[in-house]
Amino acid sequence: MILPVQNPRMKVGVISDIHGNKVALDAVLEDMPPVERLLCAGDVVGYNPWHAECVEFVRERDVPTVMGNHDRAVAGHSSFGFNSMAAAGVEHAREQLDDDQKAWLGALPVCHTACAGRVRLAHGHPTDPNRYTYPAEFEPGLLDDEDVLVLGHTHVQGHEVFEEGIVVNPGSVGQPRDGDPRAAYAVLDLDTMSVEPRRVSYDVAAVQEAIREAGLPEKLASRLEDGR
């Protein structure tokens, strides 16, 4: 439940790497405790078949969102090297989205500050959106003036709390890769400066069926049950 409150001392829901998985996104939103803001660290589209529905969710609710590498590719201006599975998801998204939706993806910022400057969003790394920054690499030097840096891209949930602030990856809503197939997200408490990583089960079989019906690669379906 997202409450209509703007307050720098608040609870904030953080999501990333939805990747067109509306079934998982719906499960996350149903599971999420009351928060006063929702933030997204990019890659709204790709891999799974509900690209338009996921774009419209974040767009209609004006969820602060940064551009992920799949978002950039679908918008048509990316040199990021994709494997065949990722490329198939990008092409499917390009076919499913209208020009206005693709333009919206292409206009997303690379970095964004929210919550009165207390939270900064970046997809892969603060200086390189294509760089993978795994939780083992989290260190205070990643932080600038913000209290919390939110990253995505790796699909691996994790966070570290330092004297200087917090670095957190909420994990992937739509395609987890940390061995847990449940959809991942996190809740930040900017009052206590704490992170609650959360997981929620969703109907993986229904998503697998939709992936196959869309003609996407089989591996995109099978990997969901393993969380890899």
What is each of the regions a protein language model found here?
Residues 7, 80-88, 115-144, 176:
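Active-site-proximal segments of metal-dependent phosphoesterases and phosphodiesterases across multiple
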Residues 11-102, 106:
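Core catalytic region of metal-dependent phosphoesterases/phosphodiesterases
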Residues 19-24, 46-49, 70-76, 113, ...:
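Active-site environment of divalent metal-dependent phosphoester hydrolases
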